[in-house]
Design a protein with these regions (language model features):
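Active-site entrance/lid segments in N-terminal catalytic domains of soluble metabolic enzymes
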Residues: 1-148, 152
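Short, glycine/acidic-rich beta->alpha junctions
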Residues: 53-54, 165-166, 182
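Short glycine/serine/threonine/alanine-rich loop segments
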Residues: 67, 156, 178
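Structured core elements
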Residues: 98, 159-160, 182
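Core active-site phosphate/anionic-ligand binding loop and the adjoining beta-turn-alpha structural block
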Residues: 104, 165, 175
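Short acidic/glycine-rich loop or secondary-structure boundary segments that cap or lie
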Residues: 106-107, 167-169
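Glycine-rich beta-strand-to-loop/alpha-helix junction loops that act as flexible
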Residues: 157-165
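A compact, surface-exposed functional segment
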Residues: 171-183
Length: 183
């Protein structure tokens, strides 16, 4: 049923936004990850964004298709692991990199200790969050991106997700080097 839904949902989205870039956010942690990715490609998805684990096999699953791929990372270490692995094994880099910070919802790549260190584990996050600490992590991720951009002579767009509520939040993300935000 889920595989059939991929086709019908994409068709509905194309009818509503024929010029839009349409894709799926597919969690690595799902039991049928490879099947979902392959079906999304078959359905004509423009992009697959993938997290809830490192999407190490994503390039292989979309090989030969026009579908773009975007891993979700939360640390410079995870960005380096995925970029190095894709470079070594598939001779490619992400078409887009999504950075999900500790304020993003969903399946985050943070331990409870990390969330506590960033002040993102309280009932009063707007007053306890240490943005400057996570900004340093984002800068580290951007250095990884730059390294692979230089190697491939190709820009890797970066979208920052989590904690984006206001115009000032968007401007701050852009100051950190993001090309886009995900809300």
């Amino acid at each position: 049923a889920n595989l059939r839904a991929i086709h019908s949902e994409l068709k509905t989205a194309r009818e509503k936004a024929p010029q839009g870039v349409l894709g799926f956010n597919i969690m690595v942690a799902t039991k049928e990850y490879a099947s979902y990715v392959k079906e999304a490609v078959k359905a004509g998805a423009d992009i697959i964004i993938s997290g809830a684990g490192l999407p190490v096999s994503l390039p292989e699953l979309v090989e030969g298709a026009k579908t773009k791929i975007a891993p979700i990372v939360s640390t410079a270490k995870s960005a380096m692991v995925i970029c190095k692995m894709w470079d070594r094994k598939y001779k490619r880099i992400p078409d887009l990199l999504v950075i999900e910070g500790p304020l993003a919802g969903g399946h985050l790549g943070f331990s409870r200790e990390d969330l506590s260190r960033y002040g993102a584990d309280t009932k009063d996050v707007p007053h306890t969050y240490h943005q400057d600490l996570y900004d340093e992590e984002i800068r580290g991720i951007m250095k990884v991106v730059k390294q692979f951009e230089e190697k491939y002579q190709k820009h890797i767009p970066v979208a920052i997700a989590g904690g984006i509520y206001t115009r000032e939040d968007v401007e701050h993300a852009m100051e950190l080097g993001a090309d886009a935000v995900q809300v």
